[in-house]
C-alpha cells in the first residue's frame, strides 16, 4: 500500500506561526545525496584570489497570510558551486549583512552525501562566524583579492539583501572591476539592491527561479503562504532579462555574470564557474 505524505507545512516550534516545507514537497524536491559530479580540475588555481560569499543571516520570511516560512540559504545551492570552486583552487570567505551566522535550510541538507557533508563540516566555521559585509565593502579596491562574489539561493536571499546598500556596493565593485558574479535560484534577488542607484547590471541576462513557480509552491505546502512580492518582476523593472520561465537546471553566462535557475542547476553552475574562473586566472 502506498503511503501518502502530507502536503501540510510542518510546524517549526522555534518560532510562533512558523513552518517548514511539507513532507510531500520535501519528498519531491530534496534528496539525502546530491548530484555532485564532474569535479575534475587537474590544474587548480594556486594564486591569492578567492570568492566572497554573501550569505543569508535571517531565517523567517513572512508570507501573505501572516505565517512565516522557515528558510535561509539552500544547502545544495550553496555547497555544490563552492565544492567545484574549492576543488579548482579557489578558497572562499563568507559575509552576511549583520555579521551574524549564516542560516541554512537544513531540511534540504544532503545528509548522506559522502563528499558534500565532509566539505560542509570542514568549512562550517566560516558560515558560523562570517565577516560583516560592511567591513568587507569598506576595504574593497581595485587590488582586492576577491575574484568573484557568490550569492547562494534559498528564500533567505529575499530577506534583507535586496535592500542592502552594502550588497549594492559589493556588486558595483565586482562589475566595475571585472570580477565574476555568481548566483542561482532566489540568489539574484540580491541584485535588487542596485535598484535605487548606479545599476551596472542593467541589460544583463540571467537564469533565476521563476515567479510562476513560486506562485505554485504553496499548493504542495512548500511554503505556508504566498510571497508578498516576486523578485523576478522587480528584476525586470530594473532592466534585467530572465531567460528561463521553467526549472530545468539551466545555467547562463552573460559576460562575467554566471547564473542558474534552481538547485537542479547547482552542479552545472559550479562547473561553469570553476571553468570560467580558471580560464580568467590561469597562471
Swiss-Prot record:
Zn(2+) binds at residues 86, 91, 123. It is found in: Cytoplasm. GO terms for cellular component: cytoplasm. Induction: By heat shock. Keywords: Cytoplasm, DNA damage, DNA repair, Hydrolase, Metal-binding, Stress response, Zinc. Protein and nucleotide deglycase that catalyzes the deglycation of the Maillard adducts formed between amino groups of proteins or nucleotides and reactive carbonyl groups of glyoxals. Thus, functions as a protein deglycase that repairs methylglyoxal- and glyoxal-glycated proteins, and releases repaired proteins and lactate or glycolate, respectively. Deglycates cysteine, arginine and lysine residues in proteins, and thus reactivates these proteins by reversing glycation by glyoxals. This is Protein/nucleic acid deglycase HchA. The gene is hchA.
